[in-house]
């Protein structure tokens, strides 16, 4: 028997729920998309008052299962039970009405609306005349935020908030539905260390209130810090569930990838050549000031700094996204004027942006179209026409080399996992055969197996003589991959560290000056 969402909601409201060991359970779940079995007979069991992490490589099926539990997708087979009662979730609204809320990696809030309006959208309190009672709405919001320990003004427009604060609004909105289950997809991907600590305090408080939290993450340290137990998926199959205290980091990696990852940072000593890119006294009014650095052939220059230090802004200016106010950019010792990305590409420069959804992928296009848009090389153009067969073969070979998981090149890129999207974007730039490669957060939101593969690719390009600039918020990545580290703070370069002398303490000291 399948209980309708409305019936289950009534059962929840009455408190007369069936006795059950698990708050939420899914068994025998199968989901197919054209050419792909995303989930194959998987299971997932969530206990009340626990944080249950979901681990796996990109494309393992984690997000697909969570979207099924949140009512976004419907399974082809299997059963979902809430507090022991079978339930069918035909839409996200069904899930919300039954106490299951999902906070997506790309936050779904209205920037032009206030905090309170976002939280109570379509559920606003009304006065006797049937109009929205704004006073009551703001009072309810204040009470809710205070209960959660969130310090926000209910009347502030969401567009004025930081990513971390917007996330707090999403959590408050989920709790306002009296949710029993809260699904969080990569919640710390864009947060500072201090913001992560605040988020974890709120998660622990929610756990104490008996809420079951599903926590999707690629960050191993978070699993051990916040999760009570975890489940691993691989290639659409359920691998196992364990208490986080019973396993080591290496155990989890083996479960995730089905193989040993012998070296996360395969950095090799390669000959460092002449200066390829030289930046002198670069300024962007109100953003960064007097930035100077050189990058040599075969060198990986790591760029570290706290959020807001200006790292990404410098990269965008060097690539011509935002032209500089003053300063000089030289390639092979000759000053160049880079006033657009097209000009940068013509100088064999490549730029992998930090936000693959907004500024990297063209989500409505397929893999082939996304990979080929940056290719301006003569070998793919003859008499003004693109040689489509040669270009398609090159893209297909690149996908094989990067191990992109897809049934074919005509799959829309929005249907790929985050890690596979990132591989496609890297492939886009590898096809241009760049001499200068700028990577901004190249492994953000990527699983441990894909990270190792991307690190290997970066080292391979350095070995081929490419000058690499790698911006990263992950300290082990900066220290493990860089020949030198440039550190920024509040729009200024505060120092350089050679690989042999770079430590986390020294980098953080320079990043906070």
From Swiss-Prot:
One of its GO terms (molecular function) is ATP binding. Pfam families: ABC_tran (PF00005). It catalyses: D-ribose(out) + ATP + H2O = D-ribose(in) + ADP + phosphate + H(+); D-galactose(out) + ATP + H2O = D-galactose(in) + ADP + phosphate + H(+). InterPro entries: AAA+_ATPase, ABC_carbohydrate_import_ATPase, ABC_transporter-like_ATP-bd, ABC_transporter-like_CS, P-loop_NTPase. Residues 24-260, 270-510 form the ABC transporter domain. One of its GO terms (cellular component) is plasma membrane. It is a peripheral membrane protein. Keywords: ATP-binding, Cell inner membrane, Cell membrane, Membrane, Nucleotide-binding, Repeat, Sugar transport, Translocase, Transport. ATP binds at residues 56-63. It is found in: Cell inner membrane. It comes from the Bacteria. Its main location: membrane. Its EC number is 7.5.2.11, 7.5.2.7. Transmembrane segments: none annotated. Belongs to the ABC transporter superfamily. Carbohydrate importer 2 (CUT2) (TC 3.A.1.2) family. Part of an ABC transporter complex involved in carbohydrate import. Could be involved in ribose, galactose and/or methyl galactoside import. Responsible for energy coupling to the transport system. This is Putative ribose/galactose/methyl galactoside import ATP-binding protein 2. It comes from Agrobacterium fabrum (strain C58 / ATCC 33970) (Agrobacterium tumefaciens (strain C58)).
